[in-house]
A protein has these predicted regions:
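Conserved N-terminal beta-strand and adjoining loop/helix that marks the start
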Residues: 1-26
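A residue-level structural signature of the nucleotidyltransferase/glycosyltransferase Rossmann-like core
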Residues: 6-8, 36, 108, 121
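Short, well-ordered strand-loop elements centered on a beta-strand within folded domains, enriched
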Residues: 22-28, 98-101
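Generic C-terminal helix-cap and adjacent flexible tail
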Residues: 134-136
Length: 136
């Protein structure tokens, strides 16, 4: 980002669980507005902490209440309007809820890490999967 101060602040989570064989599955979401596969996240509301944003956005986009695990690496990039953006992510586990398709996310899939890596649209999301695996 060339040191530009982020104009857009956002937060989200990588929701994960163990499958029946002890492997790791992660939730990947499809956003029809961008036609991409990524992880649930969204912009911070005024006065909201990154953690509050992550919890709210994950619930709004997926229907899942979560418990926070380790903070993962932050991601910096330019958004679709070419504004510098900073997104902070956490490893998360589901405590309650169920997915219902909505305007922001029309599909959500629990996938093994290798399949998630193949499906996500952005390289920085593949890097986040590496961070998740190291953190859990």
């Amino acid at each position: 980002m060339g040191g530009a101060e982020p104009k857009v602040l956002a937060a989200g989570g990588l929701l994960w669980r163990r499958d029946t064989g002890g492997g790791v599955e992660v939730l990947v979401v499809h956003r029809p507005r961008y036609d991409d596969w990524s992880f649930p996240k969204g912009k911070c509301d005024p006065g909201e902490s990154f953690e509050q944003t992550a919890r709210r956005e994950v619930l709004e986009e997926t229907g899942y209440a979560v418990a926070f695990g380790a903070e993962l690496s932050e991601v910096r990039y330019h958004d679709h309007k070419d504004r510098p953006k900073l997104v902070r992510y956490w490893a998360m586990t589901v405590t309650d809820g169920s997915f219902t398709a909505n305007d922001e996310v029309d599909d959500a899939r629990w996938l093994p890490l290798a399949q998630a890596r193949s499906l996500v649209t952005y390289a920085h999301d593949r890097d986040l999967l590496d961070g998740l695996l190291a953190a859990i």
